[in-house]
Amino acid sequence: YKRQDLWYELLPEQNYEFTAPTCYMPAGTRKELFPIKFKFSGLNLSKEWVLPLTVEEDPSYVTNKRKGWRKALLHVLPYNDYSGNYSATAMNIYFAGSNDDPLVVDNRRAHVVDENTVFFYVGTKEDNSIDRETYKINVKFEKPIEETETKKTGNLTITATNPAINFQIIGNPTYEIWDEMDTNQPYLLHRYHVLRMEYSYDDVTSSNVPTSYRASGSLLMERKINTLIPDQDQAIQW
């Protein structure tokens, strides 16, 4: 409870807009869409944001009196084609100058920056690390070099937001994305993302003397997509 950096924060007014002041529900209907336009420019997505929504009293309808049924806390979590949870068990983190006894984390969450870019945290830094913003790196998916109907490969451009960590790319980072249909459920598409990279960085938090690390390996994400559902955000089985 003392870690205020992990608290959900109220989404600033400049980052959203209601396209209409009211939501019209025809008689006999139980649900209706209420469009909200989000603006993520300048929003720090290292933090967790919520937008409270309340159904207000009005003489033209009867609201549900059950406690909590008129209020929702909308967790604002943008996504793009590359964001999500990646398995990081094939990404080894070594002390600089060593190839033995690597450190490994189970997962790495990629957050949205823009349509073709995500960010995550280097090495063993977790999403709830108190110093996580110091170790943020942006990963941009460049245009595919090779592309077929079911597969594409290309290069990654990776940059650190904080020069103090002395982030350096080693070699040429790449991505590979391919689709496979499920053998038992023919409507279900499996989309796999593999990111291959090697980089070095300094941990500047623990002491006055930085500790250097080298990370090498790959990250893997699988998305399951129901091809029978036309809306992309609804088709993904999160």
Positions of PLM-derived features:
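Intrinsically disordered, low-complexity regulatory regions in eukaryotic proteins
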Residues: 2-24, 33-50, 56-238
